[in-house]
Structure formats: C-alpha cells, structure tokens
C-alpha cells in the first residue's frame, strides 16, 4: 500500500463528497453488514479479502485512511512506558503485537454465525456495540468530548477513564507498599503480581469509602459492591440500621405488655425463643440493608430454621404452662392486686388465709397455700404461729420443673431461690452451626458473617481475598488474623 499520494482537484472533491456521506448514520441489515446511504451498491467482502487492506476506486477510501490503517493495524507500537504494546487474548494465552494478528487469532474463538465483520478493515467481533464503536472511528464520529481539553472519544467509558487524568486523586492504593493508581484494573494487576492486599478505596473527592471493595481475582470491572443512594446522596446503610434497631426495640417492648395482659407466667427461656424470628423480620422489612458484602443469603431459609426450632421446643413449653394452669385451678383463693399485697401478711385472721405473691416478678414455683395458725389465749392446745424460717424453707424447696430442650443432651431444672435470684437456663445450642468448621454460633448475625467468608466452589477458599487454606484450622486462623477491607 502507498503511504502518501499526490492529491488532485478531482480527488479533493471526491474527499468532500466522502466526508458528507460518512456523516450519515450507519445501519446494519440481517447479515450484520454496514450499508451507506449512497448511490453505489453495497456489497459484502469475502473472508479472504478481509486479510488484505481494502482497495477501492478512490471514491470510498483515500490515501490518508490507507496510511492510518498501516500504522494502526500492521505496525507494532510503543506505549508511554517505552515498552511494546501487546494485545492479550481473553480466551487463551495468545499475545499479539499488532492488531491485524490479534484479529486473525480471534477468528478461532468466534463462531461463524456470531462473527461481525467490518467492511473497511479486517476487524471482527461478536459484539454489536464493539462494531459500532469501531465504525465511529472510521467515520471520525466521536460524540463524547472532554470539557477541559480537546479530547473526544466514541463511548462514555473512555471519557470517564480520560477524566481521571485531570484529577490529582489516586483512588486505588496498595496496602503493603506505596503503589497508587487512578485505575482499578491497574491495582488488580499489581495485587495479583506481588500478592499484596487492597486497602480502603477512596471516592472521587479523596474521602475514604469503606463500602467499596476490590475483588482482586474477579473479572468484573471496578469495585465489587455498589450501594444505592437517596435524594441527598447519602448511603442508605445507616438509615436502614437505625430502622432495624427501632423495629427490633419495638418488638421487644411489645412482649412484656402481652405478658401483663394475659397474666400467664412465662419461663425466661421462652422469652429468648420468642426473639428468634426478629432477625429475619428485620431483613424482610429492610431488604436494602447489606449484612455482608461477600454474601447474598436467602433469609427465608434462616427464618425456616428458626420456625423449625420453635416447633420442636413449643410442646415442652406448652406442657409446662398447662401444669402451671392446673396448679392455679387447685387453689380456690384468688390473688389480689399485686400493688396492694405485701410480701407476707402475718397479721391476718385465721379465717382469711394469706397468699404469697411477688410485686415485681411472677411466681416461678408450684402454687400452694400457707395456713397460719394463731395461738388462742382461751384454750391450752399449744398451737403456735409458724416462724418465718419455716415458711421460707418451704418456699425454697418446691418440686423443680424440668424443661427439656431438644438441642441439649442434658436437662437443666429451673430452681427458684428468691425474688432477686436469676433462673439459669442452659442456652440453645446448634441452632446456627457451620458444618465446614464445626463451630456453633448463638447469634444468627455472627453465623452469617462467618459463612460469608467461605467460598462457593471451595469452602476453604476465602471469599474476601481469594486465599486458599488447607483445612478448617488454617481457614479459621486466616479470617481471624488477616485483615479484610
């Protein structure tokens, strides 16, 4: 091909006509071949012709396009760092130094029915938008222009990348060295090459953004996690957490009111069990609240596990409550208002037996009647009033009530000692258990965070940084000692 040719007046007029035609939009037909709105019939080129530069009669392509084609396609280039520019194949390990050899190699990876060809050069692709951007380069159409300089490009992505050259903020930095760059892809290459760790990502204004995470071994461009913003431009994370806290506190306040209205003694273990579904309800009410950036759990599964645990424990609780109701029916006397009753009334008449009640706490042991006998001055039967120590000894030795939990191997009796003593109940076990590490969690949030570190394909591969561990011990030490941004 010739590099530069002598121009004639006829050729100048033909070039003006060509530029006018190139300004018209390009449409594609069913065969994905571009057609110009001109008087000449468009034709598709054979595959053999694609390997050679396009040579026409001068009315379609001028000498400048031929020279540009030689420079861009056939000649290797040197980048800004003084190294030869290479083109790497994403499907294999092939590396080319010219566009022409790279396009010829891509033919083996693209199916014939999906291959899109350019009529003006050997360019091929399987994506329509790539062909559209390529044709814009041929036409000289670059609608995206920089407002700070004369730079123009064919798509928005290239403009966004160019705008970083006008900024002095290096958003992406290395945690283990002084490496800093403006581009996420460059940081990923650095981290993979030297096995370094990524720190916190900066915003465009230089402020730290803990919500954006670098997926070192991922193929997707940019940070992995994005958060929606409200009208004011603030992240919805804090508002969702506050909303969940308010809803959770509202549910906690509703349980004591329910107990007071029903006057049903509830064991402390049932209060803890009643709080189990709150976590799943919080995430159902606030679906946009992110729990862990590496995990997308189905919280309906957690709710189903909680309901299954409650269904197994509920028969034991119902039996305990039925036994309490039967004991209350055996007592003919009704309890008075707790506000008016004292702890123990020793001045009552023999005909009016007094009952033992609690002002702040409900009765936890079996209900029974205390008969107080007053000594009579008229007879000599020797009846004496029971001492307070005897009454207290009877209160301290009721028949213990056992609540069997299906998740524990042994049963723990509920022993009542006094009003201020707390009832010890063995906590629920194995509700949230990691089968990979053989670790149990009492709280669903801790269990969810832990499971987020397990990989999808390899359970002992860290989902945060990509490090692969040998066994459960090495994996646990890794997530406990190594910092994850």
Curated annotation (Swiss-Prot):
Its main location: nucleus. Residues 16-37, 257-270, 345-358 have a biased composition (Polar residues). A zinc finger (C2H2-type) spans 87-109, 116-138, 144-166, 172-196, 432-454, 460-484. The keyword DNA-binding applies. Residues 59-72, 325-335 have a biased composition (Acidic residues). Residues 402-416 have a biased composition (Low complexity). One of its GO terms (cellular component) is nucleus. Residues 1-77, 229-270, 318-361, 398-422 are annotated as: Disordered. It comes from the Eukaryota. One of its GO terms (biological process) is regulation of transcription by RNA polymerase II. Keywords: Developmental protein, DNA-binding, Gap protein, Metal-binding, Nucleus, Repeat, Zinc, Zinc-finger. PROSITE patterns: ZINC_FINGER_C2H2_1, ZINC_FINGER_C2H2_2. It is found in: Nucleus. GO terms for molecular function: DNA-binding transcription factor activity; RNA polymerase II cis-regulatory region sequence-specific DNA binding; zinc ion binding. InterPro entries: Ikaros_C2H2-ZF, Znf_C2H2_sf, Znf_C2H2_type. Gap class segmentation protein that controls development of head structures. Belongs to the hunchback C2H2-type zinc-finger protein family. This is Protein hunchback. It comes from Clogmia albipunctata (Mothmidge). The gene is hb.
């Amino acid at each position: 091909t010739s590099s530069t040719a002598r121009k004639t007046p006829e050729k100048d007029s033909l070039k003006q006509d060509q530029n006018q035609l190139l300004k018209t939009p390009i449409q594609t037909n069913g065969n994905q071949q571009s057609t110009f709105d001109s008087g000449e019939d468009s034709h598709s080129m054979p595959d053999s012709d694609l390997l050679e530069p396009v040579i026409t009669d001068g009315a379609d392509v001028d000498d400048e396009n031929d020279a540009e084609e030689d420079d861009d396609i056939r000649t290797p280039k040197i980048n800004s760092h003084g190294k030869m520019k290479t083109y790497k194949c994403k499907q294999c390990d092939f590396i080319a130094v010219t566009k022409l050899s790279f396009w010829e190699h891509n033919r083996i990876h693209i199916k014939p029915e999906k291959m899109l060809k350019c009529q003006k050069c050997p360019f091929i692709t399987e994506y329509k938008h790539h062909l559209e951007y390529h044709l814009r380069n041929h036409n000289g159409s670059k609608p995206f222009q920089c407002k700070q300089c004369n730079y123009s490009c064919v798509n928005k992505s290239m403009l966004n990348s160019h705008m970083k050259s006008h900024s002095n903020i290096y958003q992406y930095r290395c945690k283990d060295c002084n490496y800093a760059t403006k581009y996420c892809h460059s940081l990923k290459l650095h981290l993979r090459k030297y096995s370094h760790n990524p720190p916190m990502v900066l915003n465009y204004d230089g402020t730290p953004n803990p919500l954006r995470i670098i997926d070192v071994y991922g193929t997707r461009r940019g940070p992995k996690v994005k958060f929606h913003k409200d009208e004011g431009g603030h992240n919805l994370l804090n508002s969702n957490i506050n909303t969940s806290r308010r809803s959770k506190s509202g549910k906690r306040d509703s349980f004591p009111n329910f107990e007071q209205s029903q006057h049903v003694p509830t064991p402390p273990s049932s209060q803890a069990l009643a709080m189990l579904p709150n976590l799943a309800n919080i995430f159902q009410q606030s679906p946009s609240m992110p729990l862990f950036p590496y995990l997308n759990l189905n919280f309906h599964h957690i709710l189903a596990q909680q309901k299954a645990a409650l269904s197994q424990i509920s028969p034991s609780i119902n039996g305990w409550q039925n036994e309490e109701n039967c004991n209350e029916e055996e007592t003919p006397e009704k309890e008075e208002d707790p506000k008016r009753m004292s702890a123990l009334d020793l001045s009552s008449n023999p005909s009016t037996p007094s009952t033992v009640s609690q002002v702040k706490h409900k009765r936890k042991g079996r209900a029974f009647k205390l008969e107080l006998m007053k000594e009579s001055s008229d007879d000599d039967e020797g009846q004496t009033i029971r001492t307070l120590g005897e009454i207290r000894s009877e209160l301290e030795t009721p028949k213990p009530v056992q609540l069997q939990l299906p998740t524990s191997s042994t049963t723990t009796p509920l022993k009542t000692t006094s009003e201020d003593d707390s009832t010890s109940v063995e906590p629920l076990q194995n509700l949230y258990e990691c089968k990979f590490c053989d670790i149990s969690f009492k709280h669903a949030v801790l269990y969810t965070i832990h499971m987020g570190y397990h990989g999808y394909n390899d359970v002992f591969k860290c989902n945060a940084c990509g490090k692969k561990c040998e066994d459960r011990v090495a994996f646990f030490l890794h997530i406990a000692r190594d910092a994850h941004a």
